[in-house]
Each structure stands twice: as C-alpha cells, then as structure tokens.
Amino acid sequence: MIGLKGILKVIDNSGATLAECIRVVRAGKFASLGDEVVVVVKKARSGSSVTAANKVKRGDIHHAIIVRTKSPVRRPDGRYVRFDDNACVLVNKECEPLGTRILSVVANELRTKHHTKIASLAPRTI
C-alpha cells in the first residue's frame, strides 16, 4: 500500500530513478498493485538536458502505475506475494509507459488490471 509521501523506485528507462507519491488517483487513501498515482521525480539519471534516453528530470510531475509493493497482496488461490521494494513505471495521461524498456520484474496483477503493455515490456512477471 502506497500512501502520500511514499518513496518509489522507478524501473523503466525514462530517466528517473526515485519518485515520491503526491496523490492517489481513483483508489481511495492508499494505492496497491496496478493503481495509478501522481508522483514527483526526486532523483533522475545524470544528464545536462532532457535527451531521448532521459525523458524526465528532477522535479517533474508525472503519473505512474504501481508495479511492486512491500505490502503483501493476496492472490485468488490464497497465496500472498510481496516484494523487497516499492516500484513504479512512469506513464502518460493515456496510461502508456514513457520508457521503452522495463528493467526489472513486475507483479502478475497488472494483467488483470488492464496494464498489459507494461506486463509485456517486463522481462518477467511474478
């Protein structure tokens, strides 16, 4: 569960590395796997200007989709899945990823929440 001021690791190649949640979109007080949040980029990859590889810079505000959480999530078969960190993927207003690659694993719940583009870009879904 990600709330206000939660720190997220950005796992795409948009140029951001850390982001802070400033709003949960349409999900109540907390966001879980597959929910949309508004984030501000706290740390970005080094670069003097915004290039093709670095699409975002520090201080930019973007929408993001939660792809991993530390908090356990119950699956329909009764198992619980949890990850070591909280992670997100930056998206535009149409929920399409800003980056062209996803650098780490994502949760399988993204497929059920209609984020199949993010799930297909990931090297592995768990």
From Swiss-Prot:
UniProt entry tagged with the keyword Ribosomal protein: yes
GO cellular component term, pick one: mitochondrial large ribosomal subunit
HAMAP family, per the entry: Ribosomal_uL14
Family, similarity comment: Belongs to the universal ribosomal protein uL14 family.
Function (record text): Component of the mitochondrial ribosome (mitoribosome), a dedicated translation machinery responsible for the synthesis of mitochondrial genome-encoded proteins, including at least some of the essential transmembrane subunits of the mitochondrial respiratory chain. The mitoribosomes are attached to the mitochondrial inner membrane and translation products are cotranslationally integrated into the membrane.
Subunit-level organization: Component of the mitochondrial large ribosomal subunit (mt-LSU). Mature yeast 74S mitochondrial ribosomes consist of a small (37S) and a large (54S) subunit. The 37S small subunit contains a 15S ribosomal RNA (15S mt-rRNA) and at least 32 different proteins. The 54S large subunit contains a 21S rRNA (21S mt-rRNA) and at least 45 different proteins.
Designated name of the protein: Large ribosomal subunit protein uL14m
Annotated source species: Schizosaccharomyces pombe (strain 972 / ATCC 24843) (Fission yeast)
